[in-house]
Amino acid sequence: PLGIIKNLNSSSKRSNKIILEVRKRTGYIGEIKIDSGFIENKKYLDNLCIFFSLLKGKKISEDIFVKLHQTKSFWNDKKQFLSHNSELKFLDEKKSMIKEISSAKLIIQTFCGTGHLESLAINKPTLILFVHDLNLLNNRSKIYFKKFIKLGIVHKTPESLLKMLETLENQNIEKWWNLKKRQNVLKKYKEDFCIFNKEKIKDLQKIINNA
C-alpha cells in the first residue's frame, strides 16, 4: 500500500458512529502483484454481503454506517447489500470521507488503498477487512499485514471482523488502539507507506472544496 496522505487533524468531536467504507474497485492497483480484478471484486463484494447478513439483529449494527463510493459501477453495490440486510444505514455518498473520519469512533476499511492510510494518518482506530490472498501483496506489505492480523487490526473473514467489533463494544476503543505494541507497529507502517504532504493546509482545503 502506498499513498499521498494529507496531514489530517483529528477532530475533538466524537460519536458512537462506526463507518465502513466501500472503495471504488475497477481492478487492482499498484500494491497488488497480479491483475485478477473481476474474480477479486466478486470475492470482495460477496464477503461484504456476508458481513452485512451477519449484522442482522446485532446491537452493534445500530452504530454502523456504510459509506459507498460516489462513482457507480455495474456491481450495484447498494442493491446487493440491501438484499442481504435491509436495515443498513448509508452516509451521503457525495460527502468527503475526510469530513467523516474524524467524527467517528471507529473506521472499517475494506481495501488497502489510500483510505486506510488516511484513517491511520490521524491515528483513528481502524479495522481492515482484507479477504484476499496475502500473497497478492508485496513482501513488505505482507509482513505488516501478518502483524496486523495478530494485533486484531486486519481480519481475513467477515466472522472475524464481527467478533472483534462485538469485543470492542464492551471495551474502551481508544485504550485498545493505543496499546504500546499496537502503536509501535502502526508507527513503523506509517513511516514506510504514508507520504505526508508538506503543503497540508492548502491541499486539504482543495480536497474539501472539490468533494
What are these regions (language model features)?
Residues 1, 83-86, 106, 111-193:
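Catalytic binding pocket for nucleotide-activated donors in carbohydrate/polymer assembly enzymes
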Residues 2-80:
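Conserved catalytic-core segment of nucleotide-activated headgroup transferases in glycan assembly
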Residues 15, 61, 103-105, 149:
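Short, well-ordered alpha-helix to beta-strand connector turns
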Residues 21, 66-69, 93, 108-112, ...:
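Short His-Asn-centered micro-motif
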Residues 53-54, 103, 110:
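Exposed, low-structure sequence patches enriched in small/polar residues
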Residues 76-93:
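Nucleotide-activated donor-binding/catalytic signature segment of Leloir-type glycosyltransferases, i.e.
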Residues 94-104, 121:
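Short acidic alpha-helix that forms the nucleotide-activated donor recognition element
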Residues 190-211:
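C-terminal alpha-helical cap of glycosyltransferases
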